[in-house]
Amino acid sequence: MTGKTVTRADLAESVFRKVGLSRTESAELVETVIDEICNAIVRGETVKLSSFATFQVRDKNERIGRNPKTGEEVPISPRRVMTFKASNVLKTRILKAHASRKAKARPANPAS
């Protein structure tokens, strides 16, 4: 893992380099796309980006949890949560990238 975090500015820079829009237009495009995704999620709509992922808001019912230190039962309030489900295409890409990094990290076996 590289540990790098990709920011809005990184996305805008990538659009600038690959698409050819100006830096300002690239930043506006990234902001517009993110705003549209956020607005749809807030409205309770499912956002499905083919070959990438699905974002969805889910209602969780009230339930009983347990304090791990004391063992005491604690009610957990009902709430809405957002879920992110990676597509099979993305999952496959991640697995291939992981396998490739793992193979590169493995030292070559010297011939005996």
Curated annotation (Swiss-Prot):
One protein family per Pfam: Bac_DNA_binding
GO cellular component labels: cytosol
Keywords assigned by UniProt, alphabetized: DNA recombination, DNA-binding, Transcription, Transcription regulation, Translation regulation
SUPFAM superfamilies: IHF-like DNA-binding proteins
GO molecular function terms noted in the UniProt entry: DNA binding; structural constituent of chromatin
PROSITE patterns: HISTONE_LIKE (PS00045)
Stored SMART domains: BHL
Domain of life: Bacteria
Protein's GO biological process: DNA recombination; positive regulation of metabolic process; regulation of DNA-templated transcription; regulation of translation
Database matches in Gene3D superfamilies: IHF-like DNA-binding proteins
Protein purpose: This protein is one of the two subunits of integration host factor, a specific DNA-binding protein that functions in genetic recombination as well as in transcriptional and translational control.
Subunit structure of this chain's protein: Heterodimer of an alpha and a beta chain.
Family membership: Belongs to the bacterial histone-like protein family.
Name by which UniProt lists this protein: Integration host factor subunit alpha
Organism: Rhizobium rhizogenes (strain K84 / ATCC BAA-868) (Agrobacterium radiobacter)
Record gene name: ihfA
